[in-house]
Curated annotation (Swiss-Prot):
GO terms for molecular function: P-type potassium transmembrane transporter activity; potassium ion binding. PANTHER family: POTASSIUM-TRANSPORTING ATPASE A CHAIN, POTASSIUM-TRANSPORTING ATPASE POTASSIUM-BINDING SUBUNIT. Keywords: Cell inner membrane, Cell membrane, Ion transport, Membrane, Potassium, Potassium transport, Transmembrane, Transmembrane helix, Transport. GO terms for cellular component: plasma membrane. The lineage of its organism: Bacteria, Pseudomonadati, Thermodesulfobacteriota, Desulfuromonadia, Geobacterales. It is found in: Cell inner membrane. The system is composed of three essential subunits: KdpA, KdpB and KdpC. This is Potassium-transporting ATPase potassium-binding subunit. Belongs to the KdpA family. The chain crosses the membrane at residues 11-31, 67-87, 136-156, 179-199, 279-299, 306-326, 351-371, 381-401, 403-423, 442-462, 507-527, 551-571. Part of the high-affinity ATP-driven potassium transport (or Kdp) system, which catalyzes the hydrolysis of ATP coupled with the electrogenic transport of potassium into the cytoplasm. This subunit binds the periplasmic potassium ions and delivers the ions to the membrane domain of KdpB through an intramembrane tunnel.
Amino acid sequence: MTQYEWLQTTLFLVLLLAVVKPMGAFMAKVFQGERTMLSPLLVPCENLLYRICGVNRDEEMDWKRYAVAVLLFNLALFVSLFAILMLQHLLPLNPQKFPAYTWQLALNTAISFVTNTNWQAYSGESAASYFTQTVGLAVHNFVSAATGIAVAIAVIRGFARRRTSMLGNFWVDMTRCTLYVLLPISLIGALILVSQGVIQNFSDYKTVPLVQPITYDKPKADGKGNPVTGRVTVKDITIPMGPVASQEAIKELGTNGGGFFNANSAHPYENPTPISNMVEIFLILLIPFALTSTFGVMVGNTRQGWAILGVMLLMMAISFAVLQGVETSGNPLVAKLGVHGVNMEGKEVRFGLAGASLFTVATTGTSCGAVATMHDSLTPLGGMIPLGLILLGEIAPGGVGSGLYTMLAFVVIAVFVAGLMIGRTPEFLGKKIEVREMWMSIITVLAAGVVVLILSGVAMITPQAVASKANPGAHGLSEVLYAFASMANNNGSAFAGLNANVDFYTILGSLAMLVGRFAPAVAVLAMAGSLAEKKYVPPSLGTLPTDKVPFALWLMLVILIVGALTFFPALSLGPLVEHLTMLGGK
C-alpha cells in the first residue's frame, strides 16, 4: 500500500470508530422510546402514523406475534412490489417505455428486495422505470433494512429482559427505525453524494453523438440459422439518467446493494470520486458497527458490545489485509506476458487498489452486495475473500440487524461449547444457555449454509444451470457457489460470469433468499423469547467472562471452525484448485 492508501484507510477507520458510540447510544434511545434531538420534529409524524395504521404503541408482542408480524408485513411488501414490476408498462414515470417484467424475473426481484438481498438478474438502466426504481425498489430498501434492525432490537430485548415473554412491538420498532435512523441519515448521505457528482433527476435518457464512430463485427444468424457476423457502425450513444443519489444513499446505509445501474457502484453516476467511494463505504458499515454499541447500552454491559465489535473489526481487517496482499501480488499468468504489477483488472483507477479492496470487504462482510470492483476479476484467492465472508454468515460486521443477531447466535454457540469444556452451566449476560437456545442458534447459523451447498450441488448436475456458466472448471464452480451463497445470505453481489436470468436461478434463487432471510430471523426471535423468560443468574467465580479478550478470540475461532467444517470441501474444489492451477501456469 502507498502512503496515500495507508492514510486514507487509517483516517476512514478512525472516523468510523469515532461515531460508533454516539450512533449506538442514539439508536438505543430511539428504540427505548426516549427523547432525542429529532423528537420535536418526528414525534408528531410518528403518532400520526400510529393513528392511521391503528397501532397501539404501548402494546407489546411475544416472539410468536413478533415473528408473524414480520412475515405478514414482508408478504404484503412482496405482493406490492411484484404488482409494480408486472404492471410497469402501465405505470407513470416510464419515459423509456420499458415493458413489464416476466413473472419469473418479477418473482425473483420482488423477493430479492423484500429480503434485503437485492440480487439483480437484470440491468437497472435497461429494465426498470423511474416509478419502479423509486416507489418500488427504493421504498423496499428502507423497509427491508428496518425489518432487519427491528428483529435485532427484539433479540437484544430478549437478552436484556427478565421473566417476561414480551419483546416489544414490531410496528413501533420498524416505524422508529425508518423515521429516526434511516430517513435522516439517507437524506444527509444523498446530499453529500450529489455534491460529488451523483446524478438526481427524472430526465429522459440522453442520446449524444460520438466524437468518432465505432465500427465492429456483430455476431448474428443468417436466414438458415447459421452463425455469421455483420458489420455495425455506431455513431451515437444513449446515456441513462435518473434519481440515483436518493436511492444510492439508502442502498448503502441499509446494506441493500441493488444498483440503479448494471455496473452498480463502479458506475461514475453512482460513485464518481474517491470521496464518494469512502462515503458509501462509511454508510455501509455505520449501522452494523453502531448496533454493537446499541446492544451494550440496552443490555447494561457496554464492554460486551465493544468485545463483539472487536471480533467483527478484527475479522474485517484480516480480510482486507489478505485481499490487498493477494491483489497487490498480481497474476503470474499475466506477468509472463510482460505485464507486471498489481491486479487492476476489473477495478476503477479512480478508487485505487486500497479503495477497491476496502469496498469489496465492506460489501461482503455486510449483506450489502454493492460492488465498486468486478469480483469475478479478482485473483482466485482474492475472490475467495468476499466469498468466504459471505459464507461465514456476513458477520464482519454483517447486515443491518442481521449481522448482529447472527453474531449473537455464534456467541451462544461459543458460550455453550466453552461451558461444556470447563464443566460449567453455560451462561451469557446472566442467562443460562440451554438446549432450546442452542437449537435456535444452530438453525440461525447453518440454515443458509445448508441451502447453499444443496442448491450448488443441484446446479452442477442441471443442464440449464451448467449452460449458464461462462467459465468451465474450478472457476465455473466458484461462480455457482458464489451465486447461491450471495442469495442465501442475502448479499446480492455476484461473479458476473454467470447468467442468472434463467428459470433455474430465478426460481431456486428465490427459494434460497426466502430461507436465508426468514429461517434465521424466526429462529433468533424464538431464542430471544426463551431468553426473555429466564431469570437473571448473578455471576460467580465459575462464570465465563464474555467481555474479555480471551473469549473474543475464542468466539472468532468458533466462527472459523464452523465455517471451515461447512464449506472447506466446496472451497477446495473452487478457488483453491483455481489458485493452484494458476500457480502451475495454466
